[in-house]
């Protein structure tokens, strides 16, 4: 299962590393949008859940992963810029579906509000329009650690909060990833955190009024940071949305344990292919994974 790899020029502004898992047997293509400072490796298990039923597209943001060496790192990217970049990739790969994780939901909502012609449906996982108490505490501490480029503290903060339900192996890999980031990546993450804290939640919700395609929101029952109850507020504004809560699971969903992987896959397939039935087998993914929010 080897993807086609490429570095794409996006309107002369950015160069973006992509991986395209393609098979002639798949009729539809889905593009995956990762969380803040996560990389294509973060979606290793999700790719296994979706491919070869779908063609799957992964990409690294210009400031991270394998896109990083191909770009000049000046001002942080805004969620609007990330949304526009996603629209360009949707057009390039002729994608019919989008699946986002965590902060990737912000860029995905921006893109969907532009009503891209090809998109038929979207899945937004581990995302909420509400900054509740636990999330605010996490963001406030994160701002301090990121501003000081305190790698040790930031790595432990993520593992002790949104990542607390991850297996110990993934926590170790997560810590190594977060603690080895470049300074501009910490600055980008600091900007993300600031944006989340300063943004009026109605901004997300109002944008939802312009989204016409079906959207599924998936949250973990144990995720107190982007909770299922908070995500349900999207129902006030989106014309066609549904919700699925993965039991006994936190923020990282299919990465956390076998049952979460099985239930996450089933939720995806029931939504993307309502008639689809499958028996899922959890595959512990070996190698390097980057899981940062």
Give the residues covered by each predicted segment.
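Conserved HGGG/HGGXW glycine-rich cap/lid loop of the alpha/beta-hydrolase fold
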Residues: 14-69
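Short beta-strand/loop motif that positions the catalytic acidic residue
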Residues: 211, 217-219
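Acidic catalytic loop of the alpha/beta-hydrolase fold
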Residues: 222-226
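Catalytic histidine-centered segment of alpha/beta-hydrolase-like enzymes
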Residues: 249-262
């Amino acid at each position: 299962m080897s993807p086609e790899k490429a570095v794409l020029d996006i309107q002369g502004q950015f160069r973006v590393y992509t991986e395209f898992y393609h098979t002639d047997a798949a009729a539809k293509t889905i593009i995956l949008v990762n969380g803040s400072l996560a990389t294509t490796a973060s979606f290793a298990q999700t790719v296994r859940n979706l491919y070869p039923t779908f063609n799957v597209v992964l990409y690294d943001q210009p400031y991270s992963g394998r896109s990083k060496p191909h770009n000049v790192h000046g001002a942080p990217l805004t969620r609007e810029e990330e949304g526009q970049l996603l629209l360009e990739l949707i057009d390039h790969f002729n994608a019919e579906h989008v699946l986002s994780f965590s902060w990737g939901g912000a860029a995905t909502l921006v893109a969907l509000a532009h009503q891209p012609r090809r998109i038929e449906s979207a899945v937004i996982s581990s995302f909420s329009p509400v900054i509740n108490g636990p999330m605010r505490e996490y963001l406030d501490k994160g701002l301090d650690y990121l501003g000081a480029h305190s790698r040790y503290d930031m790595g432990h903060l993520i593992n002790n909060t949104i990542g607390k339900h991850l297996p110990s192996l993934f926590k170790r890999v997560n810590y190594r990833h977060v603690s080895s980031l470049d300074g501009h990546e910490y600055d980008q993450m600091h900007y993300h955190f600031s944006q989340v804290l300063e943004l009026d939640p109605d901004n997300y919700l109002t944008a939802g009024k312009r989204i016409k395609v079906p959207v599924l929101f998936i949250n973990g029952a144990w995720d107190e940071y982007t909770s299922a109850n908070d995500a349900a507020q999207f129902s006030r504004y989106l014309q066609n949305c549904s919700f699925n809560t993965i039991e006994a699971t936190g923020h990282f969903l299919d990465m956390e344990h076998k049952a979460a992987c099985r239930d996450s896959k089933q939720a995806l397939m029931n939504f993307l292919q309502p008639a689809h039935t499958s028996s899922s087998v959890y595959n512990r993914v070996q190698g390097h994974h980057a899981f940062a929010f």
